[in-house]
Amino acid sequence: MEQRRVTDFFARRRPGPPRIAPPKLACRTPSPARPALRAPASATSGSRKRARPPAAPGRDQARPPARRRLRLSVDEVSSPSTPEAPDIPACPSPGQKIKKSTPAAGQPPHLTSAQDQDTISELASCLQRARELGARVRALKASAQDAGESCTPEAEGRPEEPCGEKAPAYQRFHALAQPGLPGLVLPYKYQVLAEMFRSMDTIVGMLHNRSETPTFAKVQRGVQDMMRRRFEECNVGQIKTVYPASYRFRQERSVPTFKDGTRRSDYQLTIEPLLEQEADGAAPQLTASRLLQRRQIFSQKLVEHVKEHHKAFLASLSPAMVVPEDQLTRWHPRFNVDEVPDIEPAALPQPPATEKLTTAQEVLARARNLISPRMEKALSQLALRSAAPSSPGSPRPALPATPPATPPAASPSALKGVSQDLLERIRAKEAQKQLAQMTRCPEQEQRLQRLERLPELARVLRSVFVSERKPALSMEVACARMVGSCCTIMSPGEMEKHLLLLSELLPDWLSLHRIRTDTYVKLDKAADLAHITARLAHQTRAEEGL
């Protein structure tokens, strides 16, 4: 069935006898100046578009076109929107279709003139509408240009930002990213300081409520754990600048710290909250309501600090502006809140300057209560003798190793039979040793402590080499074995320093060999250990007398 329909379709499309199209008045696009007349399609053409044959010779007058074209003069075409000629028609817009009825064959001429008048009036109305639209477009362009010119001076009047290093964007534009309506927003660094005050007040309140002295070391550790941010004394100084009536700061000693690195005799910065006395005379407590009240006071003082900078900014404008502070609800649009300078930290109490001993005379004056009266007398005579020069040109003589003999004194019964000279020499050496201990530097004291441990470490090191059955060991292995075998608790790094000192004092017994990136220790196991121990003891006594 479908195949037959397709066959019928193609059969109908075949060219047949010539068909004459009935005359009709179709609305077409305006034809050229001299349009050709439509004629019946050729019988030989199979195309849908039919050519227009020339007019039949038997006709006396050509058939009029279906639509007439409006012809304008040269002056009218060049200026179609001139306001001085409102009656001149213009070409209609492409989107509008103007229907014109053409006179058919045998139509009276007065009907044709009436239709032409209607077409002209339509074109005039279209022209008037186009003029109105053009005037509106020109007015909008002029208003937009005026608005752009008015915005230019504001942009030129803004101060240029410095070319130096800028803060991160989340700090410079922190005020713009706050939710809600714009108001008296604090800068980012001021909000961080307010958070530090809240954390500090919380830690101080906990310590104060349980009758524990709040120190800066305790508060610093707690605030850094809460904020995950560094908290230094300069931040405490800024808090004191903003809210001076919040705490009382003092430098105190003998404060228990429960910390290994701090001694009780050291001065520490204590922080005491200033609270109002209770009505019943009880000790004031830093409760949650007081914490909230102090936090609000601190935030209000920060806002007042920013208002001062805002007031100075308003005074620098041209013309200057004056806004009452109680009526201020938001900052000036050109006031950069996040560029407000930091708060200057206030001075905190510092520990008193302790007296430092720099000369032996000061050490002796300080240590008079540590020595016996006879030794004090001998040292004073020695100081007088050394102070008086033997000759004007000769330099001062060095301190003799043995002080001069003192007048004989009654010896106790336990020292009967002992030479007085021997006793004097012993006492002189003891005084010299005490003097060396009082004037010894920390590095030398640490070296002496290591020298005292060396005899025991030498025995342990020889046992390690004997058990390992190797002529040489790496420094890491030797230190690890020594740490596990020694009775004194030391780290591998400290043990390595002892081995270096041992190789420095006894290079013929213990030698170090650096191979590439490792250091190897080689020990002479055939050497006499007693002789090695005696040499170390002698070296220790020699350095103790210095």
Swiss-Prot record:
Short motif (PIP-box K+4 motif): ranges = 1-23
Composition bias type Low complexity, residue spans:
28-45
User: Which intervals of this chain are the motif Cyclin-binding motif?
Assistant: 68-70
Q: Which residues carry this modification: Phosphoserine?
A: S31, S93, S318, S380, S394
Region Interaction with LRWD1: start-end pairs: 451-546
Q: Name one GO cellular component term.
A: kinetochore
The UniProt annotation puts the region (Interaction with GMNN) at 150-190
Which terms are listed as keywords in the entry? Cell cycle, Cell division, Centromere, Chromosome, Disease variant, DNA replication, Dwarfism, Kinetochore, Mitosis, Nucleus, Phosphoprotein, Proto-oncogene, Ubl conjugation
* Processing after translation: Two independent E3 ubiquitin ligase complexes, SCF(SKP2) and the DCX(DTL) complex, mediated CDT1 degradation in S phase. Ubiquitinated by the DCX(DTL) complex, in response to DNA damage, leading to its degradation. Ubiquitination by the DCX(DTL) complex is necessary to ensure proper cell cycle regulation and is PCNA-dependent: interacts with PCNA via its PIP-box, while the presence of the containing the 'K+4' motif in the PIP box, recruit the DCX(DTL) complex, leading to its degradation.
Q: Does the keyword NAD apply?
A: no
Q: Which cysteines are joined by disulfide bonds?
A: none
One GO MF annotation is: DNA binding
Stretches the record annotates as Disordered: 1-118, 143-165, 383-415
Composition-biased stretches (Pro residues) = 392-410
Q: List Phosphothreonine occurrences by residue.
A: T29
Q: What induces it?
A: Induced by E2F transcription factors.
Bias (Basic and acidic residues): 1-11, 155-164
Localization of this protein: Nucleus; Chromosome, Centromere, Kinetochore
Q: How does it assemble?
A: Interacts with GMNN; the interaction inhibits binding of the MCM complex to origins of replication. Interacts with MCM6. Interacts with CDC6; are mutually dependent on one another for loading MCM complexes onto chromatin. Interacts with PCNA. Interacts with LRWD1 during G1 phase and during mitosis. Interacts with NDC80 subunit of the NDC80 complex; leading to kinetochore localization. Interacts with GRWD1; origin binding of GRWD1 is dependent on CDT1. Interacts with KAT7. Interacts with ubiquitin-binding protein FAF1; the interaction is likely to promote CDT1 degradation.
Q: What is known of its domains?
A: The PIP-box K+4 motif mediates both the interaction with PCNA and the recruitment of the DCX(DTL) complex: while the PIP-box interacts with PCNA, the presence of the K+4 submotif, recruits the DCX(DTL) complex, leading to its ubiquitination.
Noted disease association is:
Meier-Gorlin syndrome 4: A syndrome characterized by bilateral microtia, aplasia/hypoplasia of the patellae, and severe intrauterine and postnatal growth retardation with short stature and poor weight gain. Additional clinical findings include anomalies of cranial sutures, microcephaly, apparently low-set and simple ears, microstomia, full lips, highly arched or cleft palate, micrognathia, genitourinary tract anomalies, and various skeletal anomalies.
Q: Which PANTHER family match?
A: DNA REPLICATION FACTOR CDT1
Q: Which family does it belong to?
A: Belongs to the Cdt1 family.
Could you tell me what this protein does? Required for both DNA replication and mitosis. DNA replication licensing factor, required for pre-replication complex assembly. Cooperates with CDC6 and the origin recognition complex (ORC) during G1 phase of the cell cycle to promote the loading of the mini-chromosome maintenance (MCM) complex onto DNA to generate pre-replication complexes (pre-RC). Required also for mitosis by promoting stable kinetochore-microtubule attachments. Potential oncogene.
- The name of this protein is DNA replication factor Cdt1
Query: What is the organism of origin for this protein?
Result: Homo sapiens (Human)
Q: Give the gene that encodes this protein.
A: CDT1
